């Protein structure tokens, strides 16, 4: 068990993990947080699904503008937490150029990870059944389908279909967060 003296104190930072639905954002975010804890850092994980639930928001029929407004709420929450020295790992879609630009200018020690998974692969995985429900006309306003997603043009790390070495990828992200 670690003692208080083993806890690392860092300046606040934000690791923003983004990609389309089903890309693996939550999984990667959880792995990064676990690895940070192993390093003696006490991070916070903000997951888009959990945040929407906590805020009582359903995005199933959200317009692009409403999703953008919610993404700014997430970004501002990250800024608030990081300004108090918190290491924030956020796993959320928020695929808007406006958000990417704002984050780069306003979030301290910002590190952006883009999970660049082809739509064909996401439809095959369809872990939440979203793409199937979309094809049946049950849901609308799905990023990458109904409306175009703005993929990050300056992500610090881009991950393709399969992570060759998941441990190495998590380690790379953690090193960046720790400033190594």
Residue ranges and their predicted role:
Residues 1-15:
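Extreme N-terminal, non-catalytic leader segments
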Residues 89-91, 106-125, 159:
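Conserved phosphate-donor/acceptor-positioning beta-strand/loop module used by diverse small-molecule
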Residues 21:
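The conserved Walker
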Residues 25:
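Conserved lysine of the Walker
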Residues 30-79:
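Conserved substrate/cofactor phosphate-moiety recognition/catalytic segment
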Residues 124-172, 179-180:
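Small-molecule kinase domains that catalyze NTP-dependent phosphoryl transfer to phosphate-bearing small molecules
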Residues 65-111, 132:
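Glycine-rich phosphate-binding loop used to anchor ATP phosphates in small-molecule kinases
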Residues 50-52, 94-97, 116-121, 164-165:
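Conserved nucleotide-binding/hydrolysis micro-motifs of P-loop NTPases
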């Amino acid at each position: 068990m670690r003692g208080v003296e083993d806890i690392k104190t860092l300046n606040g930072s934000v690791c923003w993990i983004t990609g389309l639905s089903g890309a693996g954002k939550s999984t990667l975010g959880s792995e990064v947080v676990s690895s940070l804890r192993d390093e003696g850092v006490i991070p916070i994980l903000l997951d888009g699904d959990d945040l929407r639930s906590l805020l009582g928001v359903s995005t199933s029929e959200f317009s692009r503008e409403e999703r953008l407004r919610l993404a700014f709420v997430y970004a501002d929450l990250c800024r608030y937490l990081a300004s108090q020295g918190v290491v924030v790992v956020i796993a959320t879609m928020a695929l808007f150029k406006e958000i990417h630009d704002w984050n780069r200018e306003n979030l301290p020690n910002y590190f952006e990870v883009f999970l660049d998974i082809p739509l064909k692969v996401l439809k095959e995985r369809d872990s939440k059944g979203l793409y199937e429900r979309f094809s049946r006309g049950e849901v609308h306003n799905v990023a990458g389908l109904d409306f175009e997603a703005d993929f990050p043009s300056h992500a610090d790390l881009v991950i393709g279909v399969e992570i060759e070495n998941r441990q190495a990828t998590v380690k790379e992200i953690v090193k960046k967060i720790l400033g190594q």
